[in-house]
Swiss-Prot record:
PROSITE patterns, per database record: RIBOSOMAL_S19 (PS00323)
Gene Ontology terms, MF aspect: rRNA binding; structural constituent of ribosome
Keyword Endoplasmic reticulum: no
Family in the record: Belongs to the universal ribosomal protein uS19 family.
Single GO BP term: translation
GO cellular component, one term: cytoplasm
A Pfam family it matches: Ribosomal_S19
Transmembrane domains' residue ranges: none
Name used for this protein in its record: Small ribosomal subunit protein uS19
Functional description taken from the UniProt entry: Protein S19 forms a complex with S13 that binds strongly to the 16S ribosomal RNA.
Gene: rpsS
HAMAP family in alphabetical order: Ribosomal_uS19 (MF_00531)
């Protein structure tokens, strides 16, 4: 279910402050965040934000197409290693 329009998009205050400070200074350095729940705002375009996936921080470069999505969408938390290969044991037992 989507967030109510009357509430508006959510972003953590510390994240918004950090982005605004970097925009004022004209810096484009990578910074870490644990806030996967924050919505991507237009002020973030061009920045690289390292989003925590539960083990490490994954650098995410923010583009125009990402505005309106959540930061967590671009840092997957699970590693898919594929299905098990066919082995003799699985095919030989009948």
């Amino acid at each position: 279910m989507a967030r109510s329009l009357k509430k508006g998009p959510f972003i953590d205050d510390h994240l918004l402050k950090k982005v605004d400070e970097m925009n004022e200074k004209g810096e484009k350095k990578v910074f870490k965040t644990w806030s996967r729940r924050s919505t991507i705002f237009p002020q973030m375009i061009g920045h690289t934000i390292a989003v925590y996936d539960g083990r490490k921080h994954i650098p995410v470069y923010i583009t125009e197409d990402m505005v309106g999505h959540k930061l967590g969408e671009f840092a997957p938390t699970r590693t898919y290693r594929g299905h098990a290969d066919k082995s003799e044991r699985s095919t030989g037992l009948k």
